[in-house]
């Protein structure tokens, strides 16, 4: 059989996959496009996201190492404000760790069961994270706008129950979406073909993703606007009993949270809406997709952009908590002070040791 790429000035390691794709005269350009797409997938969907998820894992781990001991010291009134915050931190930590592992699984041939379990944990982390955002936002709203109702009617037990409901709903959604996602990348108890099954899955995933993100965004926007109006109202009626620092801290945290959520939602819904209208015949190793390789740049970029944004969002969330939560900020500032003292003493001891050695040599 004649090699269709033998006269090309550019040669790729992917040529053996497409030797039978003879129904084109533009094979030299198309094989270059395949190489570019694979490079985009390697760097923007594997290497860079893996680095971001490692950073997110370290930040969330450090944040939880501060938050959990502080949470244990809190009284019941303060704990009500931090139950969903702890849940959010745990979800972010597990999400970043699972996303790291999934990047590595893409390099291996894995069974449906393994993919399902990892997608299940991954989706469970993200859906519980979304619910934690909603829960913590509503509690923040009640604590600042309706403090009497919050202190009398909302007990720690009620907040724990809402947190449990959030986890149960996340489990139901995660099982559903994990089955769909695993069926796309590996054959399981049912086969998802690209002509009939995948379009339905794309639509279902788009509806689930859009609903999951719109609810937190609407909640965050409502509470943020309400807090701004509440501040103006208290100032206009001359109510100086309300601590303005409370409103300022709440608005700052909500603004950063809303920014993070908007970033996540856009990077989830835009690619998902694009995939709903995209018809893919089969995997990229099939001739049909080889012939349209020059049209696959946008799907590759969309998929990579989605992953990168999740990595950034998982970094922004604990970083905002470390910077804007006074209780957490106080602890890590003490850690930095102690570390600087230890480094200073170590440097001083090293200098003295070198100086004594020079004196002895003389």
UniProtKB/Swiss-Prot annotation:
Membrane topology field: Multi-pass membrane protein
Listed transmembrane segments: 48-68, 82-102, 126-145, 162-182, 205-225, 256-276, 296-316
Sugar-modified residues: 7, 20, 23
UniProt main location, coarse: membrane
S-adenosyl-L-methionine as UniProt keyword: no
Topology feature Cytoplasmic, residues: 69-81, 146-161, 226-255, 317-362
Keyword Disulfide bond: no
Keywords carried by this UniProt record: Cell membrane, G-protein coupled receptor, Glycoprotein, Membrane, Receptor, Transducer, Transmembrane, Transmembrane helix
Residues in compartment: Extracellular: 1-47, 103-125, 183-204, 277-295
Stored Gene3D superfamilies: Rhodopsin 7-helix transmembrane proteins
Domain of life: Eukaryota
PANTHER family per UniProt: G-PROTEIN COUPLED RECEPTOR B0244.10-RELATED, PROTEIN CBG16518
Family assignment from sequence similarity: Belongs to the G-protein coupled receptor 1 family. B0244 subfamily.
Protein's name according to its UniProt entry: Putative G-protein coupled receptor B0244.5
Upper lineage: Eukaryota, Metazoa, Ecdysozoa, Nematoda, Chromadorea
């Amino acid at each position: 059989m004649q090699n269709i790429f033998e006269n090309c000035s550019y040669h790729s390691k992917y040529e053996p996959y497409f030797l039978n794709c003879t129904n084109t005269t533009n094979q030299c350009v198309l094989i270059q496009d395949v190489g570019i797409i694979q490079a985009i997938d390697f760097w923007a969907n594997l290497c860079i996201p893996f680095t971001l998820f490692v950073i997110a894992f370290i930040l969330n781990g450090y944040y939880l190492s501060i938050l959990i001991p502080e949470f244990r010291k809190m009284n019941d009134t303060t704990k009500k404000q931090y139950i969903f915050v702890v849940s959010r931190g745990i979800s972010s930590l597990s999400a970043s760790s699972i996303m790291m592992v999934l990047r590595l699984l893409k390099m291996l041939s894995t069974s449906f069961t393994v993919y399902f379990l990892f997608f299940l944990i991954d989706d469970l982390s993200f859906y519980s994270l979304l619910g934690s955002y909603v829960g913590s936002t509503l509690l923040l709203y009640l604590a600042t706008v309706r403090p009497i109702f919050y202190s009398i009617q909302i007990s720690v037990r009620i907040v724990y129950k809402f947190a449990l409901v959030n986890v149960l709903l996340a489990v139901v959604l995660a099982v559903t979406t994990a089955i769909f996602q695993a069926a796309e990348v590996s054959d399981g108890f049912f086969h998802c073909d690209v002509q009939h099954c995948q379009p339905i899955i794309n639509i279902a995933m788009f509806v689930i993703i859009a609903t999951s993100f719109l609810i937190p965004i609407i909640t965050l926007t409502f509470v943020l606007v309400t807090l701004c109006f509440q501040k103006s109202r208290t100032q206009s009626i001359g109510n100086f009993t309300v601590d303005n620092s409370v409103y300022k801290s709440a608005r700052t945290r909500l603004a950063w949270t809303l920014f993070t959520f908007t970033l996540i939602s856009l990077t989830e819904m835009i690619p998902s809406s694009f995939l709903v209208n995209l018809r893919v015949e089969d995997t990229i190793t099939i001739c049909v997709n080889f012939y349209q390789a020059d049209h696959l740049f946008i799907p590759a970029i969309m998929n990579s952009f989605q992953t990168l944004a999740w990595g950034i969002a998982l970094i922004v969330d604990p970083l905002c908590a470390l910077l804007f939560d006074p209780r957490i900020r106080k602890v890590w500032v003490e850690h930095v002070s102690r570390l600087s003292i230890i480094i200073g003493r170590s440097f001083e001891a090293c200098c003295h040791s070198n100086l004594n050695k020079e004196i002895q040599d003389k």
